[in-house]
Design a protein with these regions (language model features):
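N-terminal glycine-rich anion-binding loop in soluble enzyme alpha/beta folds
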Residues: 1-26, 93-134
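Gly/Ser/Thr-rich loops at beta-strand to alpha-helix junctions
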Residues: 45-57, 69-75, 94-98, 162-168
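Short, acidic/small-residue loops that bind anionic groups at enzyme active sites
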Residues: 59-83, 174-192
Length: 197
């Protein structure tokens, strides 16, 4: 079996990650340093936990020899090939106001519909204020409502969860909406399954 190693970056904050700016300087240096440490420990895959970290993909990947996945948004070119009609793909993100083209690692986002959690959702409040107490039932309901809105208003046929904090609600959203829901966990599983003998 495989095991996971979780490392919290000393310099990272929610405000640093969920930003319209490209990450550089000491935080980017720390990401590379931690990735190299994980590689030295024998990790065969390195990921982040924030979908806004796409802009660091090429820099971190250039510094390690193992696969590096910065964001679930790396799924976009594949899904745009499979779901080819405009508005087929929706993205549920932590904050749609901060999500910019550079977060998509250079991939075309034309025809993709973005919906955010920002404003009055429970998950947004808890993450942005770094609280620990979460009303799970309310969060699940609001995540499902946001995806339902993407379906009702735009006719999306699949959704990418940008934020890994959305992953616990994936099965509920799939059951409630009957559409395909993708996240970072799917990218990790894709890699894991490819290594199985």
């Amino acid at each position: 079996g495989s095991q996971s190693i979780v490392v919290k970056l000393d310099l990272a904050t929610v405000a640093d990650a969920i930003s319209t700016e490209v990450i550089d300087g000491p935080l980017l240096d720390e990401m590379v340093e931690v990735a190299l440490q994980l590689e030295a420990k024998g990790c065969d895959l390195i990921t982040t936990s924030c979908g806004f970290l796409g802009p660091v993909q090429s820099h971190v990947q250039a510094n390690v020899t193992v696969p590096f996945i910065s964001t679930s948004l790396l799924l976009l070119p594949f899904l745009k090939t499979v779901y080819s009609a405009p508005n087929d793909i929706g993205i549920l993100t932590f904050d749609s106001r901060a999500l910019r083209p550079h977060h998509f690692v250079g991939h075309d986002i034309g025809g993709v519909v973005v919906q955010g959690l920002e404003s009055d959702t429970e998950l947004y409040r808890v993450i942005s204020t770094d609280e620990r107490a979460l009303d799970e039932e309310r969060a699940a309901r609001e995540v499902t409502e946001r995806v339902t809105k993407l379906i009702d208003e735009f006719g999306v046929r699949c959704v990418i969860f940008e934020c890994t904090n959305l992953s616990p609600y994936k099965s509920q959203v799939r059951s409630a909406t009957e559409i395909a829901v993708f996240d970072l966990v799917d990218l990790v599983a894709f890699h894991r399954n490819a290594l199985k003998g």
